[in-house]
Curated annotation (Swiss-Prot):
Displays ATPase and GTPase activities. InterPro entries: P-loop_NTPase, RapZ-like, RapZ-like_N, RapZ_C. This is Nucleotide-binding protein lin2617. PANTHER family: RNASE ADAPTER PROTEIN RAPZ. Belongs to the RapZ-like family. NCBIfam families: PRK05416.1. The lineage of its organism: Bacteria, Bacillati, Bacillota, Bacilli, Bacillales. GTP binds at D63, L64, R65, G66.
Amino acid sequence: MASKQLKLVIITGMSGAGKTVAMQSLEDLGYFCVDNLPPSLLPKFWELMKESDKMDKIALVMDLRGREFFDSIEPALDELDNTNFITTKILFLEADDKVLVSRYKETRRHHPLEPNGSVLDGINAERELLSDLKGRSQLVINTSNMAPRELRERINNEFQTEDKDVFNVQLMSFGFKYGIPIDADLVFDVRFLPNPHYIDKMRPLTGLDEDVYEYVMKWPETMAFLDKLVDLLMFTLPFYKREGKTQLVIAIGCTGGQHRSVALTEYVGKAIQQKYETTISHRDMKRRKER
């Protein structure tokens, strides 16, 4: 059994209030997420999870979609409250009736409690059924005036751990001849810089080697570009983080991904990691050229 304290977040609340956004936000924070787990299975599920050393943060979405099981949620929560190795927090999401009706109309969905009737009747019934659960929730968020980005930001502020910056910058060098990385958010082309490939002694080396690095960096256009690129990133990264992104992939490419892109990725990485959690990788550096 895992020796450390385990964290459980139960996401519940009104249909249309943002539970999916909340679950996705917690998933980005490293929580193992399960949607629509019947409450009666909660104690058994937790018995399985506590045996895993890799899962110490769990988020479960529980709502009235499984209405026939929902009556068992109170005793299930009582049982968890009596378990000393679990810290349970209930997150309840709600919104005003007018806002919920508007959201249902926008998505053209039926309310789960009134699939063939009035959306407002379904909302009223759901609000009444969830009143006791709302009363025992540690955190209640009204999303009426929140955009999804704002809800993600609120979730991040509430649940991010103090020892981890939830915004990670991934810097990657690559070669255009092998294709642009499909997961890149930002792509920068540095093929305009002088190419060490055409210098015989540097051809078998990479941008990690001192001779190549110094060669790439000695050109005025290199340093001018790097100054502008670092300034651009330092300006834009806080706004990407504000939008709720927890990861940003920045790809820097040259022809083969061996020299220029590697050197510049190392330089930019050292600048960015002074303020942000940063990982550096070189996708194509070890590739062998086909003869």
